[in-house]
Regions:
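Repetitive beta-strand solenoid architecture
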Residues: 97, 157, 162, 174-176
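Solvent-exposed beta-hairpin/edge-strand motifs
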Residues: 151-169
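Residues that act as N-cap/strand-start positions at coil-to-secondary-structure junctions
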Residues: 110-112, 122, 134, 145, ...
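Surface-exposed beta-strand/loop patches in extracellular or lumenal glycoproteins
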Residues: 103-105, 140-157
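Active-site core of glycosidic bond-cleaving carbohydrate-active enzymes
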Residues: 1-100, 136
Length: 196
């Protein structure tokens, strides 16, 4: 998949519109490339592609199939592109890949404060809050027994004492990333918290 993403990064503008007009990439394709780039482990490309998708927005924020200022314009209110872009934005915060739940993995470093509650594809809802560039609260919510799970976060997002409340089976630090393997949790345990 990495070669496909790299090829599209290099050549997408040549054939990336919905129709053979214009000079940019259609927002649906751009959002799809954001997700694909994230799945390959790219850190910055997902946001670049989300920004590209956003370039097609009109005066009211509506997405177009093609909306190039001073150039080609086709079909406003392209809702599948808008939904695909929303999905790509969600995956900046919570993305399941390679048997892991990646938490805030693609959030830009300049975003120093954020919070979210989003479902993961693994059946767990992830709730997190960051302040001053550090995650200060992380909750996993499930309606059934779940786990064990591997969570991957950028190490710089973790504060001291961040992991004390989970049943941590293992912790590995690799290339600026921290991987936590968390033991099984039951619905009866409710919410498990990580606090800084």
């Amino acid at each position: 998949m990495r070669k496909t993403v790299e090829h599209f990064l290099a050549h997408g503008a040549k054939a990336g519109n919905m129709y053979a007009v214009g000079k940019r990439v259609c927002p649906w394709y751009a959002a799809t490339m954001s997700v694909a780039a994230g799945m390959t482990g790219e850190r910055t490309a997902p946001l670049v592609w989300i920004d590209e998708a956003g370039r097609s927005a009109g005066e009211w924020g509506e997405y177009w199939e093609i909306n190039e200022k001073g150039g080609a314009r086709m079909r406003p209110w392209f809702m599948t592109a808008a939904a695909n872009t929303l999905y790509a934005i969600d995956r900046l915060f919570v993305a399941d890949a390679d048997g892991e739940i990646r938490i805030a993995f693609h959030v830009p470093e300049k975003w120093r404060a954020f919070s979210f509650t989003l479902p993961s594809e693994a059946g767990v809802t992830v709730r997190a809050e960051a302040r001053d560039g550090r995650i200060v609260r992380l909750e996993l919510l499930g309606s059934r027994t779940f786990g064990p799970y591997r969570l991957r976060l950028r190490t710089e997002l973790l504060g001291d004492g961040f992991v004390r409340n989970f049943n941590i089976l293992s912790r590995a630090d690799e290339r600026g990333e921290t991987v936590l393997t968390i033991g099984a949790l039951s619905a009866a345990e409710g919410v498990e918290n990580l606090h800084d």
